[in-house]
């Protein structure tokens, strides 16, 4: 195959900004704006420190609409910049955690991940996303993404290779390309290969398979018709021995079958209604988001919140082979995540965004980390990992059942944890697609009033109100304006944040976190006073016109 380098002038395209984890835009905007992807990909190569000299790069994605077009452009821009060692997942597939593992195992300089994560997909109403990962396997830090944004704002020229025939990436193998005298190879790989090898280092699959067989474990796994479908069959059916009937929505589709791939109680209702009832035939259920880095865990009679999952994993790490082999060095959580894990062990508190865990993991300070937004992961890779979290829970069930010599369920483990450590009642309100200026004005009003605001929580006085600022203990960097916190004398917290993962308008997230030793109370009643206070101090209805949230988690 032959390639010729072309250069042509361009102009900046407004709105090419990076949120919590990369670019997120409506697919229709990306598709209908001339040079949208060519501009942005060139900006990435112009600005990112790990793309300034040719090295090995990995490209993959969650299978959503426009991914194949983006993949083609990334390859051709890479060729034009002298990159000769390009690795892509077959048919463009590679989950985010799998790509992190592949970057690490193949010692790549960078990874391009085509995903809008838990956002819907499709031509008309779906989103497209693209993010850059570094050589450690983790998301690009703020100093890199800021330079990419600056490059996109000032771009004047597109540099790209033109191929003499289309690339075929639907078969594993090497594609040799000669680009103006330089030979390059596009390696099309099995997107499962490196990730499954990594999972074998983390878990004892023979033991888990015996456990599944011994107790006839009934499991349901929802892949939302996204990329984890290709991984779920291998992991849950081949390695654990579960029947294929355990898998739901397991065939990846460009529009995810019209599903919203956010693994929470609202969008994973099919799984929730099948597994949570007390008379359910299922022992445990899992759902994973579009790119496979988020997880929902439910059991018969039980929903395991991400915050509780992190806390329980922190107490049961000896049941997880990865930690037995590598040691357990510490835990980090994002600031809005409930303080459940704080009652178990000392923690490091970071802003929202998996990239903030990277320095802590690279420096050996932590082994486990998690976010309230259904993300859990370990230092084995540098992304959160839905399937890894699910296998941790299967490992815990296996260990507890072995000790009890009977099948121990999710609900029993959850309630046993609460009985020992107490319970953090927790809820999140999402106000989606609100006017961006109104949302920003609301946040600024609370910042301005932080030192003078007066409120109490059913008689419990406010301890302080601030705008969370993170000081990285590894590199000394400071990240400000990460969420308005109302912290009360009993430790209860109300938190306001603007999300960085939406594609239209702004999303306001409001978090409620209250600790109690009584773990059997009604959550809605426990948090009712907090909701009233939140509406009052934020004036959210006045600013947004919304009386109710779009989603409650």
UniProtKB/Swiss-Prot annotation:
Residues 11-20 have a biased composition (Polar residues). One of its GO terms (molecular function) is phosphoglucomutase activity. One of its GO terms (cellular component) is cytosol. Mg(2+) binds at residues 117, 289, 291, 293. Keywords: Cytoplasm, Isomerase, Magnesium, Metal-binding, Phosphoprotein. It is found in: Cytoplasm. Binds 1 Mg(2+) ion per subunit. GO terms for biological process: carbohydrate metabolic process. Its EC number is 5.4.2.2. Residues 1-25 are annotated as: Disordered. It catalyses: alpha-D-glucose 1-phosphate = alpha-D-glucose 6-phosphate. InterPro entries: A-D-PHexomutase_a/b/a-I, A-D-PHexomutase_a/b/a-I/II/III, A-D-PHexomutase_a/b/a-II, A-D-PHexomutase_a/b/a-III, A-D-PHexomutase_C_sf, A-D-PHexomutase_CS, Alpha-D-phosphohexomutase_SF, PGM. This is Phosphoglucomutase. It comes from Entamoeba histolytica (strain ATCC 30459 / HM-1:IMSS / ABRM).
